[in-house]
UniProtKB/Swiss-Prot annotation:
Binding site for Mg(2+): 257, 266
Organism: Corynebacterium glutamicum (strain R)
Annotated active site: 256
Gene Ontology molecular function terms on file: AMPylase activity; ATP binding; magnesium ion binding
The protein's name in its UniProt record: Protein nucleotidyltransferase YdiU
Cofactor(s) recorded in Swiss-Prot or TrEMBL: Mg(2+); Mn(2+)
Keyword Hydrolase part of the UniProt annotation: no
Length: 474
């Protein structure tokens, strides 16, 4: 046997065994490595050369025995489209373990599509190649754009044919996160282990994500957990600020899809708008627009309310004190989101974030004229003609001496536009990855004009977005 030159840690499984069910990925009839993210592997101390061996591929499928990995399916609950489900968990996923990057930060190595677990609830536990490659390219694009996100380490085709309306090739995604602790993780701890387990999970969350609070864990007080909650709120606000600037619609902001770290997770029904509008939604199952673009800050606030419900006994010496602390912190969330959004647009416009008047004028024009935000911001960055309706704004904006160099670092030339992603995936599922690799190269170097051909910068043909619909692909 070709021995692995590394060993994953089992930090979550050891710290929270009641929330981790030991499991193994299912056997694949003919596994083949489709793509491997060498740079990400190196950054985590994983050897890409070994990962390409037959033993390495089996490792990436969750098939290696101990001691190399101690894979587990994580338990969590969740509100899905507002409806609470007490036991969700990793129904088609596994946490292989954690790898430590050079800076000492632990990162979850997590599978998606690895087969049934005890949480599958009758589903087959599998994933198909198109949606898996979709998550790979969009998550890596988001990372390159500076958005907090899970990342993609590898895609493996399984050699299995799977029925999803039509027959599709099976695949497993290997993704990476600073952790996959969710709002739904706290909901599960609250109903399964009460405040004792919730406090244990909160303490573990502090050690993984909020080092400034670690010193307080020797003698934690209500202020420790209030600070934790406020730090989580800030992470969510910062992330939604970046989504808003980029015109990104997540599409499934359930509490089980909201990570405590603030990293974007689960890209199944997401999309990038090409007409900037508040009512934009693309998910085939979001019938009533719960998760439409303009609702994203509000929905994250709703999710944060569900989180703080699980922490109330930790936030004060009495129930009334805990409730007051929760309400005060949560009451600041709308302002945190607005501040984050204004900051993002100020940076995109090359202005100081204190220039709220210009930023607000720009945002009003976005909703009035519905431009392609990517093209618009690059036209400002490159000092080319703005679209109709923005002429007067641009004239006044230029008098404020915008920082064009700073703008070049945040306003992308390339994003994973919906029509380009769909074209690349259509070819990929029949074995032609040329368009996929071309698009991946461009969107992972989004500010470099030489990273891809000019046609990858262009919006779709008129009418495409009106009919465009996304699917989870499960």
């Amino acid at each position: 046997m070709n021995t692995a030159p590394f060993k994953l840690e089992a930090d979550f499984a050891s710290a929270l065994p009641t929330m981790a069910a030991p499991w193994q990925g299912e056997e694949s009839p003919n596994p083949e490595l489709v793509i491997l993210n060498d740079d990400l592997a190196y950054s985590l101390g994983l050897d890409p050369t070994w990962l390409r061996t037959p033993e390495g591929v089996q490792f990436l499928l969750g098939r290696n025995p101990e001691p190399l990995t101690k894979a587990v399916a994580q338990a969590y609950s969740g509100h899905q489209f507002g409806q609470f489900v007490a036991s969700l968990g990793d129904g088609r996923a596994l946490l292989l373990g954690e790898a430590r990057s050079a800076d000492g930060v632990l990162h979850d190595i997590h599978l998606k599509g690895s087969g049934r677990t005890q949480f599958s609830r009758g589903a087959d536990g599998r994933a198909v190649l198109g949606p898996v490659l979709r998550e790979y390219i969009i998550s890596e694009a988001m990372h390159a754009l500076g958005v907090p996100t899970t990342r993609s380490l590898a895609v493996i085709s399984t050699g299995r044919k799977i029925q999803r309306g039509s027959v599709a090739p099976g695949a497993v995604l290997v993704r990476v996160a600073t952790s996959l602790i969710r709002v739904g993780s706290f909901q599960y701890s609250n109903i399964s282990g009460g405040i004792e387990l919730s406090q244990h999970l909160a303490n573990y969350t502090i050690t993984r994500h909020f080092p400034s609070l670690v010193a307080e864990l020797s003698a934690p007080t209500p202020a420790t957990y209030v600070s934790l909650f406020k730090a989580i709120l800030q992470r969510q606000a910062d992330t939604v600020g970046k989504w808003t600037r980029l015109g990104f619609v997540h599409g499934a902001l359930n509490t089980d899809n909201t990570l405590i770290s603030g990293e974007t997770v689960d890209y199944g029904p997401c999309a990038f708008m090409e007409r900037y509008r508040g009512d934009a939604k693309f998910s085939s199952i979001d019938t009533y627009g719960r998760y439409k673009f303009e609702n994203q800050p509000m929905i994250l606030g709703w999710n944060m309310a569900r989180l703080v419900e699980t922490l109330l006994p930790l936030l004060g010496a009495t129930p009334d004190e805990g409730m007051t602390a929760a309400q005060e912190a949560l009451g600041e969330f709308d302002d945190l989101c607005e501040q984050a959004i204004r900051k993002e647009f100020a940076t995109a416009l090359g202005l100081d974030e204190s220039d709220t008047g210009t930023v607000e004028q720009f945002r009003e024009l976005l909703y009035l004229h519905n431009p392609d935000i990517t093209t618009l911001l690059r036209s400002l960055t490159d000092n080319t003609a703005p679209p109709s309706g923005f002429e007067a704004f641009v004239h006044d904006w230029k008098t404020q001496d915008p920082d064009f160099e700073a703008m070049q670092a945040v306003n992308p030339l390339f994003i994973p536009r919906n029509h380009l992603v769909e074209a690349a995936l259509a070819d990929a599922i029949v074995g032609n990855l040329e368009k996929f690799h071309e698009l991946l190269a461009a969107v992972t170097n989004p500010f470099d004009p030489t990273a891809g051909p000019d046609e990858l910068r262009l919006p779709s043909e008129e009418g495409f977005e009106e009919d465009y619909m996304t699917f989870c692909g499960t």
